[in-house]
Regions:
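Short conserved segment of the HATPase_c
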Residues: 143-155
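Conserved catalytic submotifs in the C-terminal HATPase_c
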Residues: 58, 83-92
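Short helix-loop "hinge" at the ATP-lid/N-box region of the Bergerat-fold HATPase_c
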Residues: 111-112
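Glycine-rich ATP-lid/hinge loop adjacent to the conserved G-boxes
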Residues: 156-166
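Short beta-strand/loop element within the Bergerat-fold HATPase_c
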Residues: 118-130
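Short conserved segments within the C-terminal catalytic ATPase subdomain
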Residues: 74-85
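Acidic ATP/Mg2+-coordinating residue in the GHKL
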Residues: 138
Length: 177
């Protein structure tokens, strides 16, 4: 409940900035995006402790969730100059929509955080037997081979993560949970 009370003023500030476009509002919007992302991580961290109570599997349109996650990150994506390549998706899948959206938001934020000079983010699907696999890939700086075994550990930021001040080491941990 307390997280939602924090998110309400963040959303209100974002709307005010969007309605009053000035030079300084762009920077404020980016900072609000970061604040919102950390708040989301706190919310999902709390939820991850009791997924059996929170997880709700339903039929969902994958394209809708992908486009919602892109919209969630529009200021980050625009500021970063990230080029998006999103494949048309007709698939419906059974999953928890809010968790899929959270995971996509984390992956998009990581793609922006660890981008190269001319960043590209690709989102597509492919079928594997009776499953639909959602593929999110970028051309970022990558993950050191020595860090790969630990990237899903709680609090682990890795070699590249330690160079970026906004790394918490909680995002991929929550994605895996």
């Amino acid at each position: 409940q307390w997280i939602h009370e924090i998110k309400t003023p963040i959303t209100a500030m974002k709307l005010l900035c969007e309605n009053h476009r000035m030079d300084w509002t762009k920077e404020l919007l980016l900072e609000l995006e970061k604040t919102n992302r950390f708040t989301e991580q706190a919310l999902y961290y709390a939820r991850s402790e009791h997924t059996e109570k929170d997880y709700s599997v339903r039929e969902m349109a994958l394209s809708q969730v992908v486009h919602q996650a892109i919209a969630d990150n529009k200021y980050l994506l625009l500021q970063s100059g990230m080029r998006l390549e999103v494949e048309e998706m007709q698939d419906t899948v059974y999953s928890d929509e809010k968790w899929v959206r959270f995971i996509l938001n984390q992956l998009i934020a990581n793609a922006v955080k660890y981008r190269t000079e001319q960043p590209v983010l690709r989102i597509s699907t492919h079928k594997r037997q009776d499953q639909v696999v959602l593929v999110v890939e970028d051309d970022g700086i990558g993950i050191a081979a020595s860090d790969l075994p630990r990237i899903f550990e709680k609090g682990f930021t890795g070699q590249n993560g330690r160079m970026v001040q906004q790394s918490t080491g909680i995002g991929l941990y929550l994605c895996k949970r």
